[in-house]
Each structure stands twice: as structure tokens, then as C-alpha cells.
Amino acid sequence: MHITITGNLGSGKSTICKILEDKYGFEIYSTGKVQRELAREMNITTLEMNQLMCSDRKYDTMIDDATARISRENRDKNIIFDSRLAWHFVEQSFKIFLSVSLNVAAERVMNDNRGKEEKYATLKEARDMLAARAATEDKRYKDMYNLNYFDFSNYNLVIDSTYHTPEKIASIIMQEAKNFETVMKEKVYEAGNQGINRILLSPKRLYNKTVEIAEAADLKDLVEEYKKVTNYLDKTIAVHKSGDEYTVINGLLEVKAAALAEVPYIPVRLD
């Protein structure tokens, strides 16, 4: 099985990939490492490297070609491609996007002691730089490949990493990947997400306010029912997405009950 994993900066991709490697026996192919090494060799930041790649395609071509070649030559191996665009270049894969709130992403990179990313003096600086890097990458992918990187419909699984442990997320990823593999045994791979597109967000990402005592009492029965849920609800909630924020269109009571019951995830549909 081939899994391609990408997502927001600070979403924990590397940590989750390491768990999938250690616990489930996947081999990691990280093109992000190649990009960081190129930036270090040129004595520039990752952001500057991304900006340079807007005008010099040889770096992108090198990464893209290597990714496609490895996937073709190792179809029978369990490989995770930790790469921004591997979902586009690997012909047959379970495509994952890790989502995380900008505030939590900024906190994570501020506290990152691995020495692989730039250091930030304040949380605001981290937020601003993460937003700038995301905008630069988004523009580059649109200009060079005509791809909308942040379009969730590109992926088979979009999963929120804001509130849950990497171990929990890795477990759900493997469950969904196995389900995908079972379905695809009866299908032929085509371009796109193969008609499989699940978006899982934490209830706290959808509603992070305190539920009033009176309302919590009214939701008691639903909360007790939801306490039995181990991974995600079997109901899909319609939401509107605007940048980093989500607004629940219908099903707000279910979201509040899920938050009170500490349900890990809610499936959502973007309207």
C-alpha cells in the first residue's frame, strides 16, 4: 500500500509518519527533507527556497520525478510519501491531508527543538510566517501545476490534528487506509479521489466555547449516547469553511454534544 500524506505546516506529519513506520512497518519517503537540505546548502530559509522555486522549476522537477519513480518501482511495498504533492504524482495511493488550526500550528513550531525549521521570537511572528509560507506554496502550485493544494476534495481523508495525539490519528489513518484498500480491490484507479473523500474534524475545532449548564442538561441523553463513540460519529455535519475558521450550518446541537462527550471526530461536508 502507498500512502501519501501532506497538510498544513505544523500539523505533525513527520511524527505521524514515524508512528506509521514503527508500528505498521511502512517505509518513509520524505521529499520535505530534500527541500530543506537544498535550502541549507544555499544558505537560505525554507520560505526563501519556496519563493526561489516559483521561478526555477528544476528543484520541483527533481522532487516530482523522484517521487513518481519510487512509487512506480515499489508498488508492492508499504510506503508513506511525506510530501506536499505526492498525492498528485503517486499514481495509486491513499491520499491524506492533515489539518491544524493556525494558532496550534504556531505554538508547535515555536516549541519545536529539532532545529529543522526557522525559529520565531513571538507567537504572532510564527503565525505570520506560517501564513506567508502557506500562501507562497499555494501560489506556486497553482502557477506551476494548476493545482489547488488546499482543496479538500483532492484527498481521500482529511483529518484534524489540532487536539488529538499522533497515536490516535495514526490509528484512524490505518483504519481508513485499510477500508480504502478493500474498496479499491474492486475498482480501477482513476484521476482524483476515487469517489472517497472523508473530512474528520474535532468537535472543539467546530465549537470551542463553553456549553451553558442549562443547554448541557438538555443534551444529556445525546451526550451519553456519544460517549460510546471511539473514533467519529456516524452522522455528517454541514459546515462552511473560511480560511482557518469553520461555521456549522446544521447540526450544532450534535457538535456541542460531541464536544461534551469528548468524541474524537465528526465527519463534515463543506457547503
Features from the language model and the residues they span:
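Conserved lysine of the Walker
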Residues: K13
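Hydrophobic positions on the alpha1 helix immediately C-terminal to the Walker A/P-loop
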Residues: I16, L20
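Conserved phosphate-donor/acceptor-positioning beta-strand/loop module used by diverse small-molecule
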Residues: Q92-K116, Y120-M129
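Short, charged/polar connector segments at secondary-structure boundaries
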Residues: F180-D271
